[in-house]
């Protein structure tokens, strides 16, 4: 197995572990949170990440991750599922590790729209087109709340059934509304509560899932 983690990264993880100390996250949840903390130097994410929906107790399997979101993410990455991201910064943050692991195709929504449709942003327009072509992809939104709202509306209308939604846009306009819309959907999802988020957070979550999938593969 090719080495995927640089010694400096592992040293940073050890520093984070010492700073965090005891916590209530599962090992897989913590692996994701730690990667996000490493990407942002912000320990608040330990408490802001949400993984949903939980598996029903009747379906509990001790050999599966606790959360359907993590399980679906790992399974989908292993099977080469397309990853749709909202902006190029997210793509740049994940493509190196994607190429060294499962080589999933990466599509960027904003590249699907050189001109925005009337009344929409370019990212929103591009997201519409990605949904039509890749309704079951892994969707990763790190920047544009309008893109996340567009995706949520498509899911609610039955036009999209993503393998996983990573919804972590950042900012003050439309962000809380978009995250709330995602939280009300039954689809597998990883999101960040509040105004924090961003492309480094989105990329960190994907990279953590890639490492979990690679190690357990």
From Swiss-Prot:
Q: Does the keyword Transcription apply?
A: no
Reactions catalysed, semicolon-separated, are: Co-precorrin-8X = cob(II)yrinate
UniProt cross-references to Pfam families, sorted A to Z: CbiC
Q: Which keywords accompany this UniProt record?
A: Cobalamin biosynthesis, Isomerase
Q: Locate the residues binding substrate.
A: 12, 35
GO MF, one term, reads: cobalt-precorrin-8 methylmutase activity
- Annotated active site residues, numbered on this chain, are 38
**Pathway assignment:** Cofactor biosynthesis; adenosylcobalamin biosynthesis; cob(II)yrinate a,c-diamide from sirohydrochlorin (anaerobic route): step 9/10
Please give the start and end residues of each transmembrane region.
Answer: none
Q: What InterPro entries has UniProt attached to this entry?
A: Cbl_synth_CobH/CbiC (IPR003722), CobH/CbiC_sf (IPR036588)
GO BP of this protein: cobalamin biosynthetic process
Source species, domain of life: Bacteria
**Its EC number(s):** 5.4.99.60
Reported function: Catalyzes the conversion of cobalt-precorrin-8 to cobyrinate.
- Outline the subunit composition: Homodimer.
**Family from the record:** Belongs to the CobH/CbiC family.
What name is this protein filed under? Cobalt-precorrin-8 methylmutase
User: What is the originating organism of this protein?
Assistant: Synechocystis sp. (strain ATCC 27184 / PCC 6803 / Kazusa)
Give the taxonomic lineage as stored in the record. Answer: Bacteria, Bacillati, Cyanobacteriota, Cyanophyceae, Synechococcales
């Amino acid at each position: 197995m090719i080495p995927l983690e640089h010694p400096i990264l592992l040293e940073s993880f050890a520093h984070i572990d010492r700073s965090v100390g005891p916590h209530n996250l599962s090992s897989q949840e913590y692996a994701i949170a730690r990667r996000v903390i490493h990407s942002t130097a912000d320990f608040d994410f330990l408490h802001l990440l949400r993984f949903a929906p939980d598996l029903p107790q009747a379906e509990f399997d001790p050999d599966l991750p606790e959360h359907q979101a993590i399980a679906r993410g790992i399974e989908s990455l292993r099977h080469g599922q397309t990853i749709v991201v909202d902006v190029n910064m997210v793509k740049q943050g994940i493509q190196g590790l994607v190429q060294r692991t499962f080589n999933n195709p990466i599509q960027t929504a904003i590249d699907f729209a050189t001109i925005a449709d009337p009344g929409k942003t370019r990212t929103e327009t591009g997201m519409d087109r990605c949904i039509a072509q890749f309704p079951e992809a892994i969707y990763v939104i790190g920047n544009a709340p309008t893109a996340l709202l567009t995706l949520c509306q498509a899911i609610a209308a039955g036009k999209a059934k993503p393998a996983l939604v990573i919804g972590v846009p950042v900012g003050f306009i439309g962000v809380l509304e978009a995250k709330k819309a995602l939280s009300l959907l039954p689809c597998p999802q990883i999101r960040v509560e509040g105004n924090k988020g961003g492309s480094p957070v989105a990329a960190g979550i994907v990279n953590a899932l890639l490492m979990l999938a690679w190690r357990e593969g």
